[in-house]
Amino acid sequence: MSFLEELRSLARLYRQQFKTTFATMVQYRASLFIWMIGQVLEPLVYLIVWSTVSNGNGGSVGGYTAQGFAAYYLTLMIVNQVTYTWIMYEYEYRIRQGSLSFALLKPVHPIHSDISDNLSSKLVTLPILLVVAGLLALVFHPVAAPTVWAVLAFIPALVLAFLVRFLMEWTLALASFWTTRVSAINQVYFILMLFLSGQLVPLSLFPHWLQVLGAILPFRWMVGFPVELVLGRLTPLQALAGLAAQAAWLVISLVLVRLVWRLGVRVYSAVGA
């Protein structure tokens, strides 16, 4: 099969996956509504808490006013939605139930099905979340100072953030090849993500050593960096360094996915799955 034929095959897969995902979400509207509430409530709670702290601290905390926190968490809501994955919850079930065996029989790598499913769901949910964020903006009056170059740089930063987060979490999900109880691994990962990605609080409010740790690990580059970038809180040099860090983690993620997948499939096949 030529490269162009492979691309056409993948395009058909992604198109069909979108139709399937859209039909499923329409059918299960109540579940979608509950999930969307969860996506909105978490950053909204952080926004209310830090806005209150800011107002009680002379109007500013670490350079963030109440309106600055509003801009941060409303943008975070969107960025987190774009980069969010749920694959770590699914792989344990797939392996325990044997459904992965069917995926291995297909000529296309299973990761493509997961990517297309993830993107398809976001095409459905993101417009809803944008409307909600717009309504919340009318209440909390966010203030930011983005520049043209920052907005333009935000686009590749967001794409890289999604790719790094998806590949990293897909790699961690493959731990299910060696243990069918990965909930502890997931919990440790999500705690680190909460603190070091900027979801709980902007990383600039942390002590210096935690900021350094956040810069070394991949979590900031999955969520916090695009938020800081589009809000105009980074210099051009910091933005370039951040994009370089994202590119480096993308390469690392691709290597890890290929390596761990190859090793995991061997283990899976060896036990007669």
Predicted feature locations:
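Hydrophobic transmembrane alpha-helices and immediately adjacent juxtamembrane helices
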Residues: M1-A273
